[in-house]
């Protein structure tokens, strides 16, 4: 997978290219990350990259010419078939479904805004899609871009030890992840669930599925509304809800 970055702070992306799973993917040429800094496309001695917005108001916008030239340079290197993404609070909110869609692209250019954003005409003419990582404002698009890269890179063949790791992760099936345990068997009086040490793979699978369903129902119930549950999942969820109400009833009686 090839990813081009448009950023005033390309050094920030060393966190992606030099460390962890993504850093290893870059070293193995499974993931290619190239950066373009709009400052390198300025024509004045001060390397100016911001400009005043029409209509006044606080803050500045990224200057059109250096940003557009940087995008064009990235597009020229990428060639045909590249999708240009602008990281923006106004964009579609990134979730696992979106990650899967973006991971299907062989080439992406990620435009990281700064200041108060970029000229709307650039969004209309240069940007294919806008994406957001949440309903809050950051100082720039670099951290959202790194989040997106980390998420989509997991679906590139060979990046993870097992492709199943990406497919079984939290949200991969629309559910929250189940609890995980490692040694020691007993930690401060808390014991690893016996089923996980039973060696019975089918029972372990069912336990994990039930835990995922219960966590999702308790913490993010809106996610379940989007899913077409299997018969097995429906039955497990019914059991979970019934058991929960029984516990609540006993608690009320004791109170």
Curated annotation (Swiss-Prot):
Q: What does this protein do?
A: Specifically methylates guanosine-37 in various tRNAs.
Reaction(s) the record says it catalyses: guanosine(37) in tRNA + S-adenosyl-L-methionine = N(1)-methylguanosine(37) in tRNA + S-adenosyl-L-homocysteine + H(+)
Q: Which UniProt keywords apply?
A: Cytoplasm, Methyltransferase, S-adenosyl-L-methionine, Transferase, tRNA processing
What compartments host this protein? Cytoplasm
The gene is: trmD
Q: What class of enzyme is it?
A: transferase
Which GO biological process entries does UniProt record here? tRNA N1-guanine methylation
Summarize the subunit comment. Homodimer.
Instruction: Report the protein name in the record.
Output: tRNA (guanine-N(1)-)-methyltransferase
Q: Pfam families recorded for this chain?
A: tRNA_m1G_MT (PF01746)
Whether S-adenosyl-L-methionine counts among this entry's keywords is yes
> Which residues does the record give as S-adenosyl-L-methionine binding sites?
113, 133-138
């Amino acid at each position: 997978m090839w990813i081009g970055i448009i950023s005033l702070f390309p050094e920030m992306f060393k966190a992606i290219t030099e460390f962890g799973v993504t850093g290893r993917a870059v070293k193995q040429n499974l993931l290619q990350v190239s950066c373009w800094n709009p400052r390198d496309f300025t024509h004045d001695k001060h390397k100016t990259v911001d400009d005043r917005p029409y209509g006044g108001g606080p803050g500045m916008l990224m200057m059109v010419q250096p940003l557009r030239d940087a995008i064009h340079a990235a597009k020229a290197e990428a060639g045909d078939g590249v999708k240009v993404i602008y990281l923006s609070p106004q964009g579609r909110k990134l979730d696992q479904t979106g990650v899967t869609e973006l991971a299907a692209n062989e080439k992406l250019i990620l435009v990281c805004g700064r200041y108060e954003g970029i000229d709307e005409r650039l969004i209309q003419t240069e940007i294919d899609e806008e994406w957001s990582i949440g309903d809050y404002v950051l100082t720039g698009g670099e951290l959202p871009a790194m989040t997106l890269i980390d998420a989509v890179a997991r679906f590139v063949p060979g990046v993870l030890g097992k492709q199943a790791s990406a497919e079984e992760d939290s949200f991969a099936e629309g559910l929250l992840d189940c609890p995980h345990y490692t040694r020691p068997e007993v930690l401060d009086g808390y014991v690893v669930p016996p089923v996980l040490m039973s060696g019975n793979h089918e029972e372990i699978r069912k336990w994990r599925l039930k835990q995922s369903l219960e966590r999702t129902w308790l913490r993010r119930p809106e996610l379940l509304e989007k899913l077409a549950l299997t018969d097995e999942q429906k039955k497990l969820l019914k059991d979970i809800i019934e058991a929960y109400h029984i516990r609540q009833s006993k608690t009320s009686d004791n109170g």
